[in-house]
């Protein structure tokens, strides 16, 4: 979901690795241990939660989280909670990283000190207010000044203990006076619309005996200030909770009698002091935040066209895509946007075939084919993740769930056996699990996605042509990906492939490790399988699988998935679970009385239907066939005073649903829109608000069947597997080329050196693969020109945006230090560029 900004789309995403916490304060009980979990928050909205690590003051989480960020935010925060089964979970501490500081920690493991959490540390939100100073004549004929302070509204206030009933106090304060007034309480909203005006008499001539006339300009303007405090009205005995404050000196009225601005709320000046950072422990994180500013498609045509013809360039090492892989620090950086771009334009198979064939030609030993982290290997990995994720789930998820739920002991290392465990029983348990997983894989060939099969066919042909004396190389070239890089890693770490929500427990993790090792060896078709294990107990266990039927099953499977032109008519017809989870739904009006209006339900989406159930595994309470989904749109918060709501519109009614957070709401809207995109009766207009009390809240139309009053949002690609924005991927590639511009220039030098010098290669150029210096130089020149043109467009956009930026507007409230730094930097840049 992109934020539109005058024709330019802004995409935000974050990839997080939550490592471990250390030296948490001990629990004040006899055990001193804690049961802790970590949450990821956009400001204070939780978007992810790790598993609970029990009885530890140094919990290891080892969890990964990725999301597209659908809204603006100021801080990426991480809270460490201590679980309490009897009371509300307590916060131990938090890490808050300002959005502008995220690049400092980009893709680096970093230890952060946990900070104390109190009312002042949790301040967030902004306030819109107006000040107006006017002269009035009193009944006695004396002229005095009156200040009108209007509190218009607030946005994004924190939610305290699940609720927010805010009010504001407005105080005119000076050295010798303090006069306070209070707004009404606004119930159940963190975006209150106050629109209240308070009047203060600024000058009081009678109180000044030494002067017959009071000079506002000379005396009061530097001494008085307006202070606005936001509070959450509470029924608890501890009193109302502080939400934030702002202070405005009346000197802002020197130039004009009126003033209007947005302000960020701030903590109190005398807020409670934090504990020493090392009192609360620390948290290890790795954060990759990406922000893409994407222009319209025509801006990217030169660079995109250059990339898309990479498969046709001879040699392929002189192509723009291959050059990107050469200059990036890690091949994975280049592979991700390249594969997505080529998939979007249907060019991934010829491109991967070209670079894989070139790699095979450089390989000397058939036993090491595709074993390195080359661009070809990384591109195939990425293609399997994108195109094969549903195939992976259909194939492995039932077996993985059974292993996690049955929890049978499978330890076969005699040294690690627990008391009471039997080695033979454990071996039999493990053998049954391996058989179940192995057969699930080898019988899934007909479901393998076509794009993967086409790539495997090209790998097989290239390997067989290069190593004609090795009859098995046509199998190992394919198995090195489908087994070694696809199935085995998914079995080993199912949470990384969304097969499980979190890391598995230690016993299950050990079982999956043993299964993964065995399946990987079975798939490798190694001639000396027992010798491939370092551990003697694994070699002993593998004797169970020395029968020829296992090798035959692997070969039949590999033959099937690497066949040319195979198409599976059943693959699209099979029900595929696309997304599931708990959400809140509103009753659809079948019973008007005696029923709770909002209920928690388990939702499940397949490529056939959208259903909800009382709980996971139950029979569906309601089902919507995909062809009956006419539109999926956000629902305005004012409809039910609830955030993160959306509507699934059907022919007869709309189903109103509340997701758990903004990220989850975006994910559901996107996937539901995708699967219903091809429906012939999709709506073009809809009602953005609910139908309540006999009319639509948005347009006031009385009929529940009245046509919509707002246009439906733009559709997404209909392919249920892939949602790729070609312009965004080209922008990503531009950013990488721009980041590694010095390497591009160095590569140009290397081409020139190779063209004129025939001797030993200079060491500084030896890292580049340059088969044809002239062709490579030609492509480099085009790449640098394309990147330069886009860089100029970005620079012009920044200059134009800076000219239009107003400090104190709703988009850029006063009080953001990082924005002040931005203003200063842009001012300096503009000065230098004149």
Curated annotation (Swiss-Prot):
Residues of the signal peptide = none
Q: Which residues carry this modification: Phosphotyrosine?
A: 66
- What residues does the record give for site: Arginine finger? 371
Residue positions where Phosphoserine is found in the record: 77, 809, 833
Q: Which GO terms describe its cellular component?
A: cytoplasmic side of plasma membrane; cytosol
Instruction: Name all C2 domain ranges.
Output: 1-112, 123-263
Concerning SMART domains, the annotation shows: BTK, C2, PH, RasGAP
The name this protein goes by in its record: Ras GTPase-activating protein 3
Q: Which gene encodes it?
A: RASA3
């Amino acid at each position: 979901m992109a934020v539109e900004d005058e024709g330019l789309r802004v995409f935000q995403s974050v990839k997080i690795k939550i490592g471990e916490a250390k030296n948490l304060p001990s629990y004040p009980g006899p055990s001193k241990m804690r049961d802790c979990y970590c949450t990821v928050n956009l400001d204070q909205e939780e978007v992810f939660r790790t598993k609970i690590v029990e009885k530890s003051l140094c919990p290891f989480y080892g969890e990964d989280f990725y999301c597209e960020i659908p809204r603006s935010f100021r801080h990426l925060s991480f809270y460490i909670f201590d679980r309490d089964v009897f009371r509300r979970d307590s916060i131990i501490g938090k890490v808050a990283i300002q959005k502008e500081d995220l690049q400092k920690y980009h893709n680096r493991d970093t230890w952060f000190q946990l900070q104390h959490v109190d009312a002042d540390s949790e301040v967030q939100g902004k306030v819109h207010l107006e000040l107006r100073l006017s002269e009035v004549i009193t009944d006695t004929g004396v002229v005095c000044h009156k200040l009108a302070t209007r509190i218009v509204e607030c946005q994004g206030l924190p939610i305290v203990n699940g609720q927010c009933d805010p009010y504001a106090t407005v105080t005119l304060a000076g050295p010798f006076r303090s006069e306070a007034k209070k707004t009404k309480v606004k119930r159940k909203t963190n975006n209150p619309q106050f629109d209240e005006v308070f009047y203060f008499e600024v000058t009081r001539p009678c109180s000044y005996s030494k002067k017959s006339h009071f000079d506002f300009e000379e005396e009061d303007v530097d001494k008085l200030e307006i202070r606005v405090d936001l509070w959450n009205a509470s029924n608890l005995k501890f009193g109302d909770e502080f939400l934030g404050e702002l202070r405005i000196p009346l000197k802002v009225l020197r130039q004009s009698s009126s003033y209007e601005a947005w302000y960020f709320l701030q903590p109190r000046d005398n807020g409670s002091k934090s504990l020493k950072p090392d009192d609360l422990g620390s948290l290890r994180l790795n954060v990759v935040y990406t922000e893409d500013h994407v222009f319209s498609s025509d801006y990217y045509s030169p660079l995109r066209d250059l990339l898309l013809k990479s498969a046709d360039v001879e040699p392929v090492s002189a192509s723009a895509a291959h050059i990107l892989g050469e200059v990036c620090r890690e091949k994975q950086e280049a592979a991700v946007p390249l594969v997505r771009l080529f998939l979007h334009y249907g060019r991934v198979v010829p491109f991967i075939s070209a670079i894989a064939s070139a790699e095979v030609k450089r390989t000397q030993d058939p036993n090491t084919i595709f074993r390195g982290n080359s661009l070809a290997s990384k591109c195939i990995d990425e293609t399997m993740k994108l195109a094969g994720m549903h195939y992976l789930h259909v194939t492995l998820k039932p077996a993985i769930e059974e292993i996690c739920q049955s929890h049978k002991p499978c330890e076969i290392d005699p040294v690690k056996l627990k008391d009471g465990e039997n080695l033979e029983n454990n071996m039999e348990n493990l053998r049954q699990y391996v058989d179940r997983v192995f057969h699930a894989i080898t019988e899934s060939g007909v479901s393998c996605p076509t794009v993967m099969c086409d790539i495997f066919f090209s790998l097989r042909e290239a390997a067989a042509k290069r190593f004609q004396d090795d009859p098995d190389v046509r199998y190992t070239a394919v198995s090195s990906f489908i087994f070694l890089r696809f199935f085995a890693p998914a079995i080993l770490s199912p949470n990384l492939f969304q097969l499980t929500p979190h890391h598995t427990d230690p016993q299950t993790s050990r079982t999956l490790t043993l299964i993964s090792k065995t399946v990987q060896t079975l798939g490798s078709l190694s001639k000396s399988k027992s010798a491939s294990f370092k551990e003697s107990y694994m070699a002993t266990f593998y004797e169970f699988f020395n029968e020829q039927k296992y090798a035959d099953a692997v070969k039949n499977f590999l033959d099937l998935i690497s066949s040319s032109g195979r198409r599976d008519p059943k693959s699209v017809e099979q029900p595929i679970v696309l997304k599931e989870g708990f959400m809140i739904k509103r009753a659809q009006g079948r019973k008007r009385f005696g029923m709770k209006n909002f209920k928690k339900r388990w939702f499940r989406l397949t490529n056939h239907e959208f259903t909800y159930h009382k709980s996971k595994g139950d029979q569906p309470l309601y089902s919507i066939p995909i062809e009956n989904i006419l539109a999926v749109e956000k629902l305005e918060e004012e409809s039910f005073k609830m955030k993160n709501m959306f509507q699934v519109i059907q022919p007869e009614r709309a189903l109103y649903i509340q997701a758990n957070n903004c990220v989850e709401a975006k994910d559901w809207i996107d996937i539901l829109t995708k699967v219903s995109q091809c429906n012939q009766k999709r709506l073009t207009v809809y009602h953005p608000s609910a139908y309540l009390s006999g009319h639509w809240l948005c347009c006031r139309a009385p009929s529940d069947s009245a046509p919509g009053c707002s246009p439906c949002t733009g559709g997404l690609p209909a392919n249920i597997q892939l949602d790729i924005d070609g312009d965004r991927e080209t922008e990503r590639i531009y950013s990488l080329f721009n980041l590694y511009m010095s390497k591009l220039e160095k590569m140009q030098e290397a081409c020139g050196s190779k063209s004129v010098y025939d001797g030993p290669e200079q060491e500084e150029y030896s890292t580049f693969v340059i088969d044809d210096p002239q062709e490579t130089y030609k492509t480099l020149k085009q790449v640098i020109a394309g990147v330069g043109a886009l860089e100029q467009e970005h620079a012009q956009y920044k200059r134009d945006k800076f000219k239009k930026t107003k400090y104190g507007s709703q988009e850029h409230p006063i009080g953001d230090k990082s924005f002040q730094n931005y203003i200063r930097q842009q001012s300096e840049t503009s000065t230098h560029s004149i």
